[in-house]
Amino acid sequence: MEIPNALPERGAAPAGPVAPAQVQPIVVALIGLPGAGKSVVARALADQLGLRRVCRDTIRHAMFPVCSYSFAEKRAAFRAVMLALEINCLLGESTVIDGVTFSRRRDLVRVDSVIRHYGFTPIPIYLDCPPGVAHGRIASEIEHNQHVARDRTPDLVYEVQARFDTPPPNALVVNANQPAADVCRIVVDAVAGIRRGSPANDAPQGGVA
């Protein structure tokens, strides 16, 4: 994802003490294996920075309550995510995209094609999680019935890993093999800094690869 020059945010109330003139409108794309912790981080960004969370899993469940998790159903839900993203851009609202692994670089290109006309800054963040750790997390989720996507199995981790494109060179890489609270803090601090106009390489470095 290429980071374009950002325009001042239109219509969105800033989160926390940041003045409106200092805030860039942003779109965060969380990249990572199933079980990397994308949803936990997305919720933290929504709660702490006021980003609108657009989740493909939630949208797919609403569109197809009885779902076979086919390619067609997943792509329909992804199209709906892109539509929701564009509406948020029209409203001047920053977004975090959840429920998408972005294992294929072309999906990040789709995000760019939606937001480039609105002057939003794309922030790709790769949650780097060892497959074995992600596998164990999903197994625990299944045991406790904690995820809406019923096709989400431990073996899905290795299926996605096999087709995972290398994240874009400008992605912020965060070590996701650490406590969720630490991962969330690192990402929230980094995104808050970029949103204020700080260069990505000035973001907090604790746990960032």
Feature roles, as predicted:
Residues 30:
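Hydrophobic anchor at the beta1->P-loop junction of P-loop NTPases
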Residues 76-118, 122:
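Glycine-rich phosphate-binding loop used to anchor ATP phosphates in small-molecule kinases
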Residues 1-25:
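Extreme N-terminal, non-catalytic leader segments
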Residues 118-138:
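Conserved phosphate-donor/acceptor-positioning beta-strand/loop module used by diverse small-molecule
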Residues 36, 40-91:
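Conserved substrate/cofactor phosphate-moiety recognition/catalytic segment
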Residues 33:
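P-loop (Walker A) phosphate-binding loop of NTP-binding proteins
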Residues 58-60, 102-103, 128-133, 179-180:
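Conserved nucleotide-binding/hydrolysis micro-motifs of P-loop NTPases
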Residues 143-186, 194-197, 201-204, 208:
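Small-molecule kinase domains that catalyze NTP-dependent phosphoryl transfer to phosphate-bearing small molecules
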